[in-house]
Amino acid sequence: MHARLCSLAAAVALAAGAAPSLAQLRVGEWNVTNYGGAGARDAAFRTALYASFNGRQFAPDVLVGQEFLSQAGVTAFLANLNSAAGSPGDWAAGPFNNGADTDNAFFFRTSRVQFLGMTIVSVGSGSPNHPRDINRYDFRPVGYSGAAATIAAYSSHMKAGNTADDQARRLLEAQIIRANAASLPSGWNFLLAADLNIPSSAQSAYVELVGPQANNAGRFFDPILTPGSWNNSNAFRFVHTQDPAVTMDDRFDQILLSASLLDGLAFDYIGSLSIPYSTTTWNDPNHSYRAWGNDGSSFNNLLTVANNQMVGPTIAQALIDAANGLGHLPVFLDLRVPAQVASPTLIDFGTVSQNATAQATLTVTNAGNTTLWTVAGIANLRYTLAASAGFTAPGGTFTEAPGGGSNAHTISMSTASIGPKSGTITINSDSPDEPVRVVMVVGNVVAAACYANCDGSTTIPILNVNDFSCFLNLFASGDPRANCDGSTEIPVLNINDFGCFLNAYSVGCP
């Protein structure tokens, strides 16, 4: 992983503490505890999802869920997402498959996310297999089509318990998920949003997910750099997610990311990759990752309601009520969407005299959709320029922020030889939809004009008595073209211009 500090705009947003997802792409994870359909908990879910406290709200763009009991449960939860006060009402659900136990679900905002499809990665069953199905949901942000703008989101609800059999079944599930991630199409990003039921980062299943191996293509990373023995440890009280209705003492619910979402290029986690999550405050300005509702004051108790500093009493109580007596807090993180490159497709130098300077300007723009994502929600464009033979472009790596500006680059064309010229300027960038953008460059180089050939004739001999007559006529009429020596003295035309013309005539034309 490459260490990278947040941009100033993102840092300001983070300092506000889990602000609504008005710009970035917010991904949420929530085990909804045996949800089978419309019922007494629905009002609590709606409040937890869209109520606001001090400008903060959950308001995800993508929600990965576990412990759905049926298609009716998915349909009812979708209705909660669309009917909650403050909801944009643009939610849809991915396909539901009814496995052997409780099941996964995937919800997304259609104005911001393109859903590509669902894959049943592995079917759950009894021991020694993992107990529940593993699902993968593939999507992209609206306005993108490239592989590097695609995310495969895995949903998993691993085996609970700490017997040898429990741990072996979790390890098997981790192995299956990592192997599937390693087989994804080239350039894809991936994440795991799951109820891991893992009490410590030292357990084999977690090591399998995040540890280095000979093949690291399917490796996951904890974006908040918080390994440890999470269970019943006060040191991790700000990241505990279970159980808001009983005792907050486990970090079972997590979102893990691929290296490609943590490299500072294109699709990217909004947060610092060099600083672990705070152990002294829930409102960590270095991370967008949050355990929604956990202000760190609930260790070994049910979730704090009165004076809850993160979400206030109304949302805190809703999170408890949604847990159904034994449940989980949602977690979320924010992603910055990739840049999009734009430039002219053609640069025409026109007609240029031989050996004259020929320059033109190439403008490169970050065309990310700021109306949809805002400036803070789009990554900077990073690119280099490469010119074909006969043309030159500036070297080095360039950066262009979103928001309507552009970088201007001087492109030069060689004029050493006569004739039509053509070539390309290649923009190599981290724009996922067009990583290689080719700009055509054309021009025409002609012989320099010969001053002594006053009448512009092309017959042989080019210079003859007609050129003397032409020059005399220009001089007599006061035409500025007779100012052969380029003088500015008064009179501008004088005997020196005759001498200048005779010298040019004696030199001849090439």
Q: Language-model features: where?
A:
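Cellulosome-associated attachment modules in secreted, modular CAZymes
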Residues: 444-510
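Divalent cation-coordinating acidic motifs and surrounding scaffolds
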Residues: 23-339, 439-441, 446
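Cleavable N-terminal signal peptides
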Residues: 9-11, 21
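Acidic glycine-/aspartate-rich tracts in secreted/extracellular proteins
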Residues: 33, 69-70, 82-83, 112-113, ...
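Hydrophobic alpha-helical membrane-insertion segments
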Residues: 40, 166, 204, 337, ...
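Feature for long, exposed domains in two main contexts
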Residues: 337-448
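Bacterial N-terminal signal peptides that target proteins for export
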Residues: 1-9
